[in-house]
Amino acid sequence: WKDLKKINAGSKFYERKDLNRKTSFVLLKEALSIFDKLCFNLDLKESGMAEKVYKIIKETNAEDRTLVSSFSPSRLDEFIELSNGEILTSGSFRENVIARYFPTKKRNLKIQALQAPFIYRGLKVHSRKLKDFCEINNLYLHIWTVNNNEDFDKCLEFGCDGIMTDEPLKLRTYLEQNS
């Protein structure tokens, strides 16, 4: 952790004139505490993180502004069992497959959202079937990774509940100009 704290985590985002500006990494607990008005979308990338992440969310009273997801069904299932529905979770690949092939069936799901890529390997993923599945099952729909105004337009026209982006300032400017 000491070594990570030395790295300038924001250097790629600064103008040349601001290269001496320093942005360090923060722990999840610090981020949830410092940015206590922001919503967080957390992805369990490694096994064994579910309990740690759950405890941090509880300690920082961030239950109502955090969504936890994972591409790994087992990691997600572990978190769902721990949180007992107290913290929003997004489906894994498994639920996205169900949505694609059985879009009109009501399911007994233990998740509250689905996340899907805008385009995957050149194919449009967000579809009417996916939107219908989310509506039938009372799920939020979040699309990732959307980085330009044209695609922001498409997501909003489509009725997405959330947009994940690598360009948060660009998205904020777009939303301010188009709301």
For each of these PLM feature ranges, what is it?
Residues W1-I87, L109-N137:
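Metal-dependent phosphodiesterase/phospholipase catalytic core, i.e.
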Residues N8, S72, V97-I98, E167:
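Poly-acidic low-complexity segments
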Residues Y14-R21, F25, R100-S179:
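C-terminal active-site rim and adjoining tail of enzyme catalytic domains
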Residues V26-L27, L76, R94-P103:
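Alpha-helical scaffolding within the catalytic cores
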Residues S47-G48, N96, K170:
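Solvent-exposed loop/turn segments at secondary-structure junctions
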Residues S70, F93-E95, I143-N149:
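Glycine-rich beta-to-alpha transition loops that act as phosphate-gripper elements at the mouths
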Residues I87-S90, I163-M164:
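Paired acidic/hydrophobic, glycine-rich loop segments that form the ligand-binding mouth/hinge
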